[in-house]
Amino acid sequence: QMCIRDRAHGIRDGILADLGCGTGELTLMLTQAGYDMIGIDQSEEMLCVVRDKAEQLGLSGRLLLLRQDLLKLDLYGTIRAAVSTFDTFNHIPDLDTAIANAGFFMEKGGVFLFDMNTPYKHRNVLGDNAFTFEEEDAACVWRNHYDAANRRVEITVDIDYHETGEHFHEQFCEYTYDLDTIR
């Protein structure tokens, strides 16, 4: 919120889009701060979580949620700014198209704030490493395989919930982009 208002060319109003909004934490925080928000995600499950949270906070009528692939972004008008967090753009195989799509709907002088994992993190931190996390109610094993030829990290996450015996398994990949490509 402060980054947009104070540091990002003074964006104090207008429509903002949260690209890859996930469970909507940032979308809802910016809505509460008075911004007109569009939360965009390709997962209907994630958008349902945002809807439920918005309803609990009394924000249902103050934001628009769209199920869209960022490689096929289609908005009804322009936006003043876009935000994208939690390495959303590392999950997209065609970064140029995704950024161009966001830019197409951006007002002149608009701002795009996003974070990404760096090539260093993909190679040296995630690499071919595995991480384990143990909590009172669950255990998580996070495995990585760095595929240098295809410039991506293949990630497998397994979570076991002790009390219920439930098991969660997910596989996905993050693509590696050099800073020159991002600029």
Can you name each region flagged by the protein language model?
Residues 13-20:
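Conserved class I S-adenosyl-L-methionine
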Residues 2-4:
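Short, small-residue-biased leader/transition segments that mark boundaries at the very start
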Residues 96-108:
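A short glycine-rich, Lys/Arg-flanked "PGG" loop and its adjoining helix->strand segment in the class I
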Residues 108, 113-183:
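SAM-dependent methyltransferase
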Residues 23:
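Conserved SAM/SAH-binding loop
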Residues 6-11, 73:
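Glycine-rich helix-loop-beta junction characteristic of Rossmann-like nucleotide cofactor-binding loops
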Residues 27-72:
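Class I SAM-dependent methyltransferase SAM/SAH-binding core
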Residues 74-81:
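A short acidic, Gly/Pro-enriched loop at the edge of an enzyme's catalytic core
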